[in-house]
């Protein structure tokens, strides 16, 4: 693989993409609105299907000279799509501020704002997903917003791994034939579902043909072969590697056009694309260099899709994370380690391009090869924040035992979005359902249920730190407060999921999720084989450090009185600086392999997980839990007053999810692994995230790379589910903040995703800069 290179074609296409400006586009919103108006008396599923079909047949499309893979959901590169079905109120309020907001800016056109206000918004006012949720439960959701962030209130869910192998096997025509056969013999209540799937698949066929027609009409010689591929794919499944990759990209473009959601993930691409690659290699119709160039064109396409979020959500999901997660390596259905040339070519593509998308993941296990690990380490050393690593030894068994996933499906797990775990092609995992702020709940428990920042009564008044005579009394009150907010969160979640069923059925997605066509049931209504929902715990590290400080300094050693600590928290440590220093330095912290401290983390993660087992989601499936933050540790920290771990009010919480608080992991990276290994992996079946930062110099020698491989093998042996790395100097980040024009291509691992550092808001940049940096293992 070392002889492979990046071609001029790829360099030119990359440069053009990176120089493209981001705009908010209303083109699809215009079509959707017209179709809904023309078919006002039809059901929402039928209107959704007709509007997607119309968009596929009418949206203006474009191609770039020299592309090997074509297709996009807008004419422009990196345009964010206004999607009225999911929510219009926020865009109506924020349209003018999109170019200047603190995070994730988009340019806007005055004529688009005018058309939106005069023609689109008036129709959708009161009719969208956002309006339905606000009208039903909006007040209650707002009341708990400092503790719980309910997601998917104004956009589609996404966070799913379609059955790409099925799509490649049948293509849209084959899936349409299957749906038509089902329609002939279906029950009355299934009829509309099959009619909708046929409509959207007809649209998919036309969409592919339109790219052929465009290339022919514009006589673009460099794309003539690509045009033929597009026409062929509209009629039958792919046969060659190039055809398979083009078909795969069409699948994901259409999924985004249907739902405008993040985290539709290709999954184990090196496994299901390998037969096409191998066949072409054996026939001498494809070289490794040609295959790499095709993959790199696909990589560029992944980076052309950006997601338009409201201003508040942009804080929680900063840097345009779109979540095309590709997982390479790992075991097969029989438990054997499997990696191949495509695994290595995916790593080579990331090595060459260093772009934020796709979110490249490597699955490791006890038998992972030296070749794969060293190829991955080489890419890590370049500092793009990729790949991240997942541990089969930690992940598969809890999926089987805790969630009831069949062994073959668990072994074939994929990752969606950042670090969320899913089965491949048969699960609506709803993995980004909500985020639960442990630290705000503790704050309320210590202060009569009142917010330290506003004195507002938010939680139950169970007493205060002054009234809890023992540490056990505090724990009992904390449990009750957690239970109270879990109940509130679950009530809100049921409302949100029901609204998605009613307002955003997804006929096209349902054709590529196993069991939906068989059942005649949309995926939002429970058509998938597995129906999970995932809740994130935010942030265990701060919680552990706070409880450890209270336990040791207040109740055990009595070095600080209950009264004084509560006063210090209420005053944000003003006048209590000596106490703050004690809280920071006199108590061992999570991440240093101190057993009693680390076990506090496991205690509360398990408590939360067990409570979640009491609930089922609106599709009849179980809730499960994860530990990852995306970028929510910054805005969620802004909701929390001063905390007993010595943290000042409004400051960010720990990054990641399983990561220690930055600057407090003093015993090195191996100690961090040992601390994290004490967390029960049944608590992270929805995904867990461990961030680490190393200096680039560590990887300059062969010895350093071998030591890093041994560190990764220790990660596997300790059964830690996830780890990822930033490889960067603090000085470079500081310079990038001051001189962003000199660091436009600097990518950084934020949480479970990579973003351009200079595109992040200042507070998030500061948090990343201050993360612990390791010089050695």
Q: Model-flagged regions — what are they?
A:
Residues 197, 204, 208-211, 215:
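Low-complexity, highly charged intrinsically disordered N-terminal segments
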Residues 1-197, 221, 225, 229-232, ...:
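Conserved catalytic cores of very large enzyme subunits
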């Amino acid at each position: 693989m070392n002889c492979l290179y990046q071609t001029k074609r790829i360099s030119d296409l990359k440069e053009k993409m990176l120089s493209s400006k981001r705009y908010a586009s209303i083109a699809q919103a215009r079509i959707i609105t017209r179709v809904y108006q023309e078919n006002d008396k039809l059901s929402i599923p039928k209107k959704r299907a007709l509007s997607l079909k119309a968009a596929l047949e009418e949206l203006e499309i474009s191609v770039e000279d020299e592309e090997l893979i074509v297709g996009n959901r807008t004419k422009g590169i990196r345009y964010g799509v206004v999607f009225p079905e999911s929510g219009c109120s926020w865009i109506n309020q924020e349209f003018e501020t999109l170019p200047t907001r603190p995070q994730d800016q988009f340019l806007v056109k005055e004529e688009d704002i005018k058309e939106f206000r005069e023609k689109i918004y008036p129709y959708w006012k009161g009719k969208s997903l956002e309006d339905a949720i606000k009208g039903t439960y909006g007040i209650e959701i707002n009341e708990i917003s400092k503790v719980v962030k309910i997601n998917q209130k104004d956009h589609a869910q996404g966070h799913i791994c379609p059955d790409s192998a099925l799509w490649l096997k049948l293509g849209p025509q084959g899936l349409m034939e299957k749906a038509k056969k089902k329609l002939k013999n279906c029950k009355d209540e299934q009829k509309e579902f099959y009619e909708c799937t046929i409509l959207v698949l007809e649209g998919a066929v036309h969409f592919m043909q339109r790219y052929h027609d465009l290339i022919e009409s514009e006589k673009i010689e460099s794309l003539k072969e690509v045009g033929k591929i597009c026409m062929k794919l509209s009629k039958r499944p792919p046969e060659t590697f190039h055809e398979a990759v083009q078909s795969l990209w069409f699948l994901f473009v259409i999924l985004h056009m249907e739902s405008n959601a993040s985290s539709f993930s290709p999954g184990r691409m090196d496994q299901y694309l390998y037969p096409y690659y191998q066949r072409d290699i054996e026939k001498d119709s494809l070289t490794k260099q040609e295959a790499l160039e095709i993959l790199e064109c696909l990589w560029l396409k992944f980076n052309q899709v950006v997601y338009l979020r409201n201003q508040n959500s942009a804080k929680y999901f900063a840097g345009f994370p779109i979540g095309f997660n590709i997982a390479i390596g790992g075991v097969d259905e029989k438990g054997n380690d499997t990696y191949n040339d495509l695994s290595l070519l995916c790593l080579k593509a990331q090595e060459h391009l260093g772009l934020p998308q796709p979110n490249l993941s490597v699955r490791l296990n006890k038998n992972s090869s030296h070749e794969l690990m060293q190829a991955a380490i080489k890419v890590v050393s370049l500092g793009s924040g990729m790949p991240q690593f997942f541990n089969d030894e930690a992940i598969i068994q809890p999926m089987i035992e805790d969630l009831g996933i069949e062994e073959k499906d668990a072994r074939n797990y994929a990752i969606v979005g950042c670090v969320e775990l899913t089965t491949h092609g048969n699960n609506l995992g709803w993995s980004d359902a909500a985020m639960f702020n442990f630290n705000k709940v503790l704050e309320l428990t210590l202060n009569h249920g009142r917010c330290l920042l506003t004195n507002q009564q938010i939680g139950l008044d169970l007493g205060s730190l002054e009234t809890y005579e023992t540490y056990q009394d505090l724990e009992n009150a904390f449990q009750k407060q957690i239970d109270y907010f879990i109940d509130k969160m679950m009530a809100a979640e049921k409302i949100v999921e029901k609204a998605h069923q009613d307002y955003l059925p997804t006929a096209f997605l349902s054709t590529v999720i196993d069991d939906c066509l068989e059942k005649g049931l949309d995926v939002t209504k429970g058509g998938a084989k597995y129906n999970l929902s995932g809740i994130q715990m935010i942030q265990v590290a701060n919680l552990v450090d706070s409880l450890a400080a209270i336990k040791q300094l207040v109740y055990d050693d009595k070095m600080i009185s209950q009264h004084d600590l509560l006063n210090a928290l209420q005053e944000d440590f003003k006048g209590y600086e000596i106490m703050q220093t004690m809280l920071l330095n006199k108590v061992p912290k999570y991440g240093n392999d101190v057993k009693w401290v680390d076990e506090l983390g496991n205690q509360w993660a398990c408590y939360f997980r067990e409570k979640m087992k009491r609930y089922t989601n609106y599709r009849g499936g179980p809730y499960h839990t994860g530990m990852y933050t995306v970028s929510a540790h910054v805005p969620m920290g802004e909701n929390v007053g001063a905390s007993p771990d010595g943290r000042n009010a409004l400051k960010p919480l720990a990054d990641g999810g399983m990561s220690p608080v930055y600057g407090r992991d003093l015993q090195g990276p191996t100690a961090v692994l040992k601390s994290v290994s004490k967390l029960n992996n049944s608590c992270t079946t929805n995904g867990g995230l461990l961030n680490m930062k190393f200096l680039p110099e560590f990887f300059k020698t062969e010895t350093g790379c071998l030591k890093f491989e041994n560190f990764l093998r220790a990660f596997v042996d300790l059964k830690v589910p996830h780890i990822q790395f930033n490889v960067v100097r603090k000085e470079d980040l500081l310079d990038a903040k001051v001189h962003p024009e000199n660091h436009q291509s600097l990518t950084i691992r934020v949480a479970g995703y990579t973003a351009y550092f200079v595109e992040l808001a200042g507070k998030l940049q500061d948090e990343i800069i201050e993360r612990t940096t390791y010089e050695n293992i």
